[in-house]
C-alpha cells in the first residue's frame, strides 16, 4: 500500500514500527520477554503454578490466565497505581482478559496438564498498542515457560498448537494505517485491534469508529493490513525462538 499521507512517525501506511523481542529478560520467571513496538515497551513474564483454579479441579486440564498493568509514569502524566485506588479499571480488566483469551486460543489445555500458566504484562512505557504488544510478547514468554516444563520432564510434548500475535490498525485522515502509535491512535477516525494465529485464523477483532463510521471496504482494508503485519510479527517470533519451536 502506498499513500501520500505523511504519518507523524514518517512510516509508510503499511509499515510496522521497529519491533524487538528480548527473551530471558528477568531472572526468576519461567519465561520472560521485553517486547518493544517503537517507544511502547512491555515486560511479559510467564510463571508456572502446579495447580489449577477451583472450577477446573479434577477436570484433567490446565489453565492460562493473564494480568496487565501500567507503571505510574508509563504515560505522559503520572497515574496512581490501581492497587492504591483499590480496584482495577474497566480498561485493565478488558485487556487482561483479551491477553488470556488470545493465548488460550493456541494452547491445548488438556496437554498442559493440571497446572496454570500466569501471564503478567507490565507496561513500562506506553506509546500506543500496549495490548497488542503484550499479546505478541506474552506468546514468546509462554513458549519459554513450556520449554522449561518439557526440559524438566513435566510435559511429554508442547501444548502450544500455533503462534499468536496482534496488531493495531486504524483509519487516520481517511487512510488505513498499520500499527498506530499514540499520536495516530489519539486522532484516528477508526481504531481496530486484531489478534490472529500463525495459520491465519482470527482470534479477536475489536473495531470502533471514534467519530466517522467506517465502510465495509475500509474494514476489509484494515483487516488486510493487520494480516500482513501479524504475519511479520509471527515470523519475528519464529526467528527469536529459533529451531524446534511450534
From Swiss-Prot:
- In this entry, which stretches build a coiled coil? none
Under what name is this protein listed? Answer: Ribonuclease PH
Per the entry, what this protein does is:
Phosphorolytic 3'-5' exoribonuclease that plays an important role in tRNA 3'-end maturation. Removes nucleotide residues following the 3'-CCA terminus of tRNAs; can also add nucleotides to the ends of RNA molecules by using nucleoside diphosphates as substrates, but this may not be physiologically important. Probably plays a role in initiation of 16S rRNA degradation (leading to ribosome degradation) during starvation.
Describe its assembly: Homohexameric ring arranged as a trimer of dimers.
Question: Which Pfam family, any one of them, does this sequence belong to?
Answer: RNase_PH_C
One of the protein's GO biological processes: tRNA processing
Q: Which reaction does it catalyse?
A: tRNA(n+1) + phosphate = tRNA(n) + a ribonucleoside 5'-diphosphate
Gene3D superfamilies in UniProt: GHMP Kinase, N-terminal domain
EC? 2.7.7.56
Q: What is the lineage of its organism?
A: Bacteria, Pseudomonadati, Pseudomonadota, Betaproteobacteria, Burkholderiales
- Keywords noted in UniProt: Nucleotidyltransferase, RNA-binding, rRNA processing, Transferase, tRNA processing, tRNA-binding
Positions binding phosphate in this chain are 91, 129-131
Q: Which InterPro entries match?
A: ExoRNase_PH_dom1 (IPR001247), ExoRNase_PH_dom2 (IPR015847), ExoRNase_PH_dom2_sf (IPR036345), PNPase/RNase_PH_dom_sf (IPR027408), Ribosomal_Su5_D2-typ_SF (IPR020568), RNase_PH (IPR050080), RNase_PH_bac-type (IPR002381), RNase_PH_CS (IPR018336)
Please state which protein family the record places this protein in.
Answer: Belongs to the RNase PH family.
Top-level taxonomic group: Bacteria
Q: Which cysteines are joined by disulfide bonds?
A: none
Gene Ontology MF terms: 3'-5'-RNA exonuclease activity; tRNA binding; tRNA nucleotidyltransferase activity
Amino acid at each position: 500500500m502506498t499513500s501520500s499521507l505523511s504519518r507523524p512517525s514518517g512510516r509508510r501506511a503499511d509499515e510496522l514500527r521497529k519491533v524487538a523481542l528480548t527473551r530471558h529478560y528477568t531472572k526468576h520467571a519461567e519465561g520472560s520477554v521485553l517486547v518493544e513496538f517503537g517507544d511502547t515497551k512491555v515486560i511479559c513474564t510467564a510463571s508456572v503454578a502446579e495447580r489449577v483454579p477451583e472450577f477446573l479441579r479434577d477436570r484433567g486440564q490446565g489453565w492460562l490466565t493473564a494480568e496487565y498493568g501500567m507503571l505510574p509514569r508509563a504515560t505522559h502524566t503520572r497515574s496512581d497505581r490501581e492497587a492504591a485506588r483499590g480496584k482495577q479499571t474497566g480498561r485493565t480488566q478488558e485487556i487482561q482478559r483479551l491477553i488470556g483469551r488470545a493465548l488460550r486460543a493456541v494452547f491445548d489445555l488438556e496437554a498442559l496438564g493440571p497446572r496454570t500458566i500466569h501471564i503478567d504484562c507490565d507496561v513500562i512505557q506506553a506509546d500506543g498498542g500496549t495490548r497488542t504488544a503484550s499479546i505478541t510478547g506474552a506468546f514468546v514468554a509462554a513458549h519459554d515457560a513450556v520449554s522449561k516444563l518439557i526440559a524438566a520432564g513435566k510435559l511429554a510434548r508442547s501444548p502450544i498448537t500455533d503462534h499468536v500475535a496482534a496488531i493495531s490498525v486504524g483509519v487516520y485522515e481517511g487512510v488505513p494505517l498499520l500499527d498506530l502509535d499514540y499520536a495516530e491512535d489519539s486522532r484516528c477516525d477508526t481504531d481496530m485491534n486484531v489478534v490472529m494465529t500463525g495459520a491465519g485464523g482470527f482470534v479477536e477483532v475489536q473495531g470502533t469508529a471514534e467519530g466517522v463510521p467506517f465502510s465495509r471496504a475500509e474494514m476489509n482494508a484494515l483487516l488486510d493490513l493487520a494480516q500482513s503485519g501479524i504475519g511479520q510479527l509471527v515470523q519475528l517470533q519464529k526467528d527469536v525462538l529459533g529451531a524446534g519451536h511450534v
